[in-house]
């Protein structure tokens, strides 16, 4: 089957990009590709044949129909207007046309210098491409909206970061790479007609049912806000901290995008900061819902030329509603509740307080709770708490709450085990794969990808364990 590509972004939004070609790496070689995703997209296996070199995965060739561009956008970074940004190391190669008429961006990260590289070198390093490939696939299999990773290419090109590292490229796929920052770019350049063109593009291609509706812009922004709310709720329920929620890292489609200094909670710490450059804790775990709203407010400002203030405020209210509703639903599922009752939040917050005092592992606590039987006086979960009396008091209230529902243990446990993962991408697991890959051993990278495809399967190995001492509180930076 021949892959078909279109260039809607290039054809319809000429002010938003610079056309250019990727700059290949030295001795580039394919070290990993996403076989399952490739099969779903009917990508010919021959394209992954190592005897053909790095090919399109390393920017050495283009496929018919590809029209590569680097996109320009702006944004607020750490709450401060940063001005023009853009694809400083990435190139949108083209948009794959799928059988249902939708498209999928092929975006090559680490593809070389662009007009938007600023002081950078246009490159990505092996460490960061491995982290993004693992994180995006982990999030996908957790059921969280995200970009996807299709391939990683390593090379002999040296790249200087804090130390000298190895240049690499990642092929990232997404329904769209449209960001809040695209709208900010033209708003602050005082070009409102181009802001409206971006909105028209989004509605035409992603919400076509509203094209001929009088209130199409208000409806569209309301949906952007709701998607963002549901996304943040998903992050909070799995203990995911993005690390760098700048407005240029926010997706119009409500996707998790731009994996940098992210981290999944080990010990439950609501103030967890994944990014060691975030000295003020702006992007700490428990502040993500507030930051997302702040970012939506910045986006709303750009839409004031063609959406009424009241409609914008209604959309922002929709964010809060979507966030709280979705978060509540997810957390009740994690606790094994099939109905909503007025004291559920209090019971959840009591558990969180107990976990915070004890330094309980976030993922393991909920997974172990999903195996606990109502009638059990003792359990492996109880044994993880030092203050057994406090746990017993909470568990008695929890057990009483479960008894209000006509659901047996087996059905409850089944539901809980579908939403409480046994495995998440802890930073130490990613680092172990990176360390091996930097020595030329890709086995752990491939093995970890396979493990992350089954996050709700119980394991008795270290993929589901608490981190070792060296793996606790690993510092992660924005450097990529």
Curated annotation (Swiss-Prot):
UniProt: Mg(2+) binding residues: 249, 258
Family listed: Belongs to the SELO family.
Stored Pfam families: SelO (PF02696)
Species, as recorded: Salmonella paratyphi B (strain ATCC BAA-1250 / SPB7)
Superkingdom: Bacteria
Gene name for this UniProt entry: ydiU
Protein's UniProt keywords contain Metal-binding: yes
GO molecular function: AMPylase activity; ATP binding; magnesium ion binding
PANTHER family in the record: PROTEIN ADENYLYLTRANSFERASE SELO, MITOCHONDRIAL
Chain residues that bind ATP: 86, 88-89, 109, 121-122, 172, 179, 258
Function text: Nucleotidyltransferase involved in the post-translational modification of proteins. It can catalyze the addition of adenosine monophosphate (AMP) or uridine monophosphate (UMP) to a protein, resulting in modifications known as AMPylation and UMPylation.
Cofactor: Mg(2+); Mn(2+)
Reaction equations catalysed: L-seryl-[protein] + ATP = 3-O-(5'-adenylyl)-L-seryl-[protein] + diphosphate; L-threonyl-[protein] + ATP = 3-O-(5'-adenylyl)-L-threonyl-[protein] + diphosphate; L-tyrosyl-[protein] + ATP = O-(5'-adenylyl)-L-tyrosyl-[protein] + diphosphate; L-histidyl-[protein] + UTP = N(tele)-(5'-uridylyl)-L-histidyl-[protein] + diphosphate
Designated name of the protein: Protein nucleotidyltransferase YdiU
EC identifiers of the protein: 2.7.7.-, 2.7.7.108
